[in-house]
Amino acid sequence: MLKLVLSRGREDHGVGVLGYLTVTPLPESSFDARRRGLHVASMDRGTAADAYAKAPWLLGGVKTIAYAINLAAKREAEQRGAHEALFVSADGYALEAPTAALIVRHGDELVTTPTGPTGVLASVTIATTFEAAEKAGMYATHRLMRVSEVVDSDGAWLVSSVRGIAPIRSLDGKEVPFDAEFHEQLTDLAGFPKVRAVR
């Protein structure tokens, strides 16, 4: 995994742009999530789905190196017997995971949460996958989804550049439909190597 971090530099020294690069092997858990899927627990993020429209200073949708909330959510998910958390707005909309975006399938339609007012981080993996899906004749859209739509779907995934395309197998203990053939197609559309999923 290649990670590039850039900052505008130290404010008090006028040093200019500062950056560093790290290269580390992908964790085995990333491949395991692609193969076996994830059991996910929903967690209230504590803000409405449009909270960041009125409060841009909260920096919703900004990638930072402050991972305390993300790590705390993952620990809470594990305490609940899940692999991962799915943040939910205070008004009941599915948002994103701490380090991954959400894709939900309804037939030939792929849906993800919009960025902007939701505070959801823009995802390179979503952009790549949705562009390829539309070229393949699918409909890909950004819209708000109730948590129930994740379970009442034709499949759902948490996606990121590190994790790849990981199917959600259950949400809050409720089984989420899984189609192994479509999972392979979605993995291919996103540009990740195929990893045979375990049913």
PLM feature spans:
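Ordered, amphipathic secondary-structure segments that act as subunit-interaction surfaces
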Residues: 1-5
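Helix-start/capping segments and mature chain N-termini
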Residues: 7, 12-199
